[in-house]
Amino acid sequence: MDPRLREEVVRLIIALTSDNGASLSKGLESRVSALEKTSQIHSDTILRITQGLDDANKRIIALEQSRDDLVASVSDAQLAISRLESSIGALQTVVNGLDSSVTQLGARVGQLETGLAELRVDHDNLVARVDTAERNIGSLTTELSTLTLRVTSIQADFESRISTLERTAVTSAGAPLSIRNNRMTMGLNDGLTLSGNNLAIRLPGNTGLNIQNGGLQFRFNTDQFQIVNNNLTLKTTVFDSINSRIGATEQSYVASAVTPLRLNSSTKVLDMLIDSSTLEINSSGQLTVRSTSPNLRYPIADVSGGIGMSPNYRFRQSMWIGIVSYSGSGLNWRVQVNSDIFIVDDYIHICLPAFDGFSIADGGDLSLNFVTGLLPPLLTGDTEPAFHNDVVTYGAQTVAIGLSSGGAPQYMSKNLWVEQWQDGVLRLRVEGGGSITHSNSKWPAMTVSYPRSFT
């Protein structure tokens, strides 16, 4: 709104509110009419200005669009110029290549001129050689005429000889003759062969046939065969013997069998049906009553065909004089002992005496080698346990071992058990109980027991 119009409206409002419009009521209508006209004029002016602004905005937008089109056209022109510059560079390269090609073409033309000069020389040589060839052809023509005369003179002789061959030549042959590759051959079966230039009969080996004195002979054993009335027969001595043996066989021949006997017609074997639960054939081929042996359990066993106590079930005593070896954490030492060994039933008891050793670790092994040192009647295998190395340990016990460095020993409780037996060497495990600084160890007497093997 126009500022002057605004001030006029404010002034009128103040005047109206001051005396309820009484003083201004007379001139108000004319002034309001004037204000309405002024407002209408201002509205028309604002409308024209607004329309002018819209037209100006449209023209600005059109100008901006034209500017964008011009920018795009300039970019296209720059791109086209760049392409033209590239094409000009390529044309320059082609022109340079054409210059090089023209130079090479000039060199090749020079070479062609040199080659044409050489071709002229070769042409002259060819002309000379053609002249020589013409002279040689004339000589050959003369020789060919001479050869024609010779062939004509020989033709009559050849015709006469060919006629003679046609009259006398063999062109076909009857069986067993045949013509193959201008040769006449004869077909022979397996019974005939050629011996030199003669036809002979083929006689296979070991048939008794032989050709001798122009005839076919048959050879036979005169001790067993003879010829009677042109027939080959057995001699009486041979025939009578065979006849006698056949008669004896017929008399002893078993044609059938009665139960419990059975005759197998396919194998010609006579056997007997038996109840295998009560009868059996012994090692002598005799029929015996089957004896039922009871299932014996240890210590009862079959002893020499009878029932008795197992030989392993008894008390045996012996001695082992050998070396006890200790090893553990780099410590190794050996001592010799005399040990009593007792075998009672299925257990073996090894009584080790007290002995003095050297330094031991917190855990180590005692090894007893039974390969040597066992006194009769025990053998190395008698010490084999029922196990070799198992999770189950035997002979577990606690032993008090005195450790010292020359003074009074201090006893440590160690756990000892059977760990392994291999190839006659029994290994005992000793560990636990702690340790002190020492150089000597005092081992008590102890007994190691474990079940032994019966294999």
From Swiss-Prot:
Q: What is its main location?
A: virion
Q: Where is this region: Tail?
A: 1-307
Q: Name one Pfam family in it.
A: Reo_sigma1
Location relative to the cell: Virion
Glycosylated residues? 231, 264, 282
Q: Which UniProt keywords apply?
A: Capsid protein, Coiled coil, Glycoprotein, Hemagglutinin, Host-virus interaction, Outer capsid protein, Viral attachment to host cell, Virion, Virus entry into host cell
Check the record and name the InterPro entries matching this protein.
Adenovirus_pIV-like_att, Attachment_protein_shaft_sf, S1_C
Coiled-coil portions? 116-148
Could you describe the post-translational modifications of this protein? Undergoes dramatic conformational rearrangements during viral disassembly in the endocytic pathway.
Region of interest: Head: 308-455
Q: What are the GO BP annotations of this UniProt entry?
A: cell adhesion; symbiont entry into host cell; virion attachment to host cell
Q: Which domain of life is it from?
A: Viruses
List the GO cellular component terms. Answer: viral outer capsid
Any idea what job this protein has?
Fiber-like molecule that attaches the virion to the host cell membrane by binding to the primary receptor F11R/JAM-A and to sialic acid containing proteins (coreceptor). The interaction of sigma-1 with F11R is required for NF-kB activation and apoptosis. Binding to both sialic acid and F11R is required to induce maximal levels of apoptosis.
Complexes and interactors: Homotrimer. Interacts (via the head region) with human F11R.
**So what family is this one in?**
Belongs to the orthoreovirus sigma-1 protein family.
Protein name, as recorded: Outer capsid protein sigma-1
Q: Which species does the entry assign this protein to?
A: Reovirus type 3 (strain Dearing) (T3D)
This chain is encoded by the gene named S1
